[in-house]
Amino acid sequence: ALCAVDNTFATPYLQRPLEHGADIVSQSLTKYLGGHSDTIGGALIVDDEELDERLGFYQNSVGATPGPFDAFLVLRGTKTLPVRMDRHCENAMELAEWLQGHDAVDRVYYPGLESHPDHELAAEQMDDFGGMLSFELDGTLDEASTVVSETEVFTLAESLGGVESLIEQPAAMTHAAIPREERIAAGLTDGLIRVSVGIEHVDDMKTDLAAAFDAALS
């Protein structure tokens, strides 16, 4: 059996699964590696010549090759990857700590917080904790919908990994087709909100979310 790891959230800058025994690492080039929400692509990374040949044969057979301009955009994005990821991580940690202390929030999911069940594991294998977080609003499905609709710094969208901050509500967007009982059982509550923390000033993000919370819950 082969072990494959999706390293999109972490990027090679923060985590390198091949060093931890993975056979295949998948990376969405659309997200942090491109970094500017203007290209589409993906990559598989291996450290085995035979496996590389097998994957290369399949890639050529199905025509899964990027266009030249898409490749240029990804290569351009890699030049600023370290400085962008440092800012994503810094902002995400500060925002997670702020959310954790906010009365409108029940729970925050971010591996950089000591309250996260996998914090120690993440600290062992990652150089930092990334720019993705989610939190559970102390409110209903409609109130969570109001929050994601009222933000101005955060753009309502399902993607992630660009320089701009994005916000989305899984229960009403990415997982809307799943019956509520199944969704709740899987941990996707009505008030769950996912955030891709961008590189804007973190104080602007806090002000934006605070105003959205007030609009939804007051």
Residue ranges and their predicted role:
Residues G35-H36, P66-P68, Q125-D128, A185-D190:
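Short, flexible turn/loop "capping" segments at secondary-structure junctions
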Residues T39-G41, D128-M132, D190-R194:
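Short, solvent-exposed beta-strand edge segments and adjacent coil->beta transition regions
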Residues V62-G63, T151-S159, A212-S218:
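A common structural junction motif
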